[in-house]
Amino acid sequence: MANSNKNQENGWGGLWTEQKLDCFENYVKAYLTIMNAYREKYHWKLIYFDGFAGCGDRAKQKEAEGKTIDIFGQGSVTKEDMHLYEGAAERVVKLDKMPGFNYYYFVDKYEDNITRLQLKLAQYDIGKRTKYLHSDANYEICRLAKFMKEDAVRRTTPDKPFHYKTLCLLDPFGMSIDWDTIVTLAGKSLDLWILVPTGSIVSRLIQNDGTLRYPETLERFFGLPQKEIHERFYIKDQVHDLFGEHEEIRKVKNSIEVISEIYCEQLGTLFPYVTNKPLVLKNSNNVPIFSFVCASYNQTAVKIAQQIITKRQN
């Protein structure tokens, strides 16, 4: 129990998880309500894709004890901690009677997570419409993007009976998604929700002494060159003292906000509509640890997302 309390204090689970899930569930309800109203008219097939499905189990995983994962040298977390990082799979599947999605894709790199998730969701009547993939999220996202691109081409043929719409949730444990992967989703008939680890992981790599820790990782994450990232997080001052004039570098005060701003700006280069105020998720010490962002080619989708976020944030 002591470990569980510590995990919540450090941000791996707790109230913020419920806030994220409540927000997303409300969006899924609104999404399905709208899509169901026009599904038959426009011959839509709906796909739900969860790139980090996990098992959604907060219970202690005894078999995970002693197995740790180091996140960029910032300390180890157990696989139990990762289970606290609850996914949205069961909440989405529970909405299947609305009706829900035509197809469900649940991805997780840990085989035991996928196995437990499959057992948990067996009680719901989603059967052959569901794929459980023990795989890397970056790889599967690129596969999804390729499928959506091919579907867009098929859509131009007069004899094609339907086309696909996708709702994609990416809530990785850390900086697992490369920006090049996100780029593949541009131009697709897809709504994206992504969890950005602002204060939990990324901020730890923006050091106070003016250096970026693991700069290559930051480049992959933001999709920006190291020089540009450095310029966003550090300010150069010309200082005059007894030794003459010299330059000092200081870190911006609102670095966690800047992380979120940069990521949203980058999403804006791929999607015409992005929530301008993401859902800011905080730990028990009221420190922002994640930003939950929605991006889409559909203005109404992001408008609804922003309304839900604003209500949750207030």
Q: Model-derived features: where do they sit?
A:
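Class I S-adenosyl-L-methionine-dependent methyltransferase catalytic core
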Residues: 1-314
